[in-house]
Amino acid sequence: MEELLSASPLLLEQKMKWINVNEQYLDYLRKVEKRIPRTDYGEDRYKPFFGILFEKDGLYYITQVSHAQPRHNKLKQQKDFYKVYDPKSPTRLIAVINLNYMFPIPKSEVFPFEKNQIHTYRTFTSEKEKSKYIDLLDIELSAINSMDIGTKAKELYSLKCNKPEHVVSKRCIDFKNMERLALQYKGEEKS
């Protein structure tokens, strides 16, 4: 299994980055798996994906953060659920990562997330609101990059593939089926 998840040396050293994903590809996956996250939640709401968690068979695995909710404070971190705390205020929960919702994407469907173009992704009531949102994204990404989340993603992938009956595995998206769909989508694009 380890050789299946080996990343190129470049990816091993790469820090996580915010990325955009072709919405048509996401809709394609959602026809089969309703838990594929959304980026667009209306004019004033937007959540980019991040990655690259790891690469497998020419596909990138990516995921997304979710806004912290009061109920998240009571939940324990597990192999598929991680809390993201503000590095400057270590008790302040700012986001959570549901790794069980990570999924594969053809490399051709990943696009850079440009902070200076944030106004094209969502609306803001003021420059101050826009600046605060960009600051939050920077803080979240800094925290994520301190968590070794790529290694944790590979471990979860291995658990799901090797022990599908494990309680954590049952909460995960069917990674193998998503890989099949991703490769199928890639093939349809070439036609």
Predicted feature residues:
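Surface-exposed beta-strand edges and their flanking turn/coil or helix-capping segments
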Residues: 32-36, 75-78, 109-120
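Ordered hydrophobic segments in well-structured contexts
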Residues: 16-20, 48-52, 59-64, 96-104
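Arginine residue identity/basic-tract feature
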Residues: 30, 35-38, 45, 71, ...
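Compact nucleic-acid interaction/catalytic patches
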Residues: 42-45, 55-95
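C-terminal terminal-subdomain/extension
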Residues: 10-13, 84-191
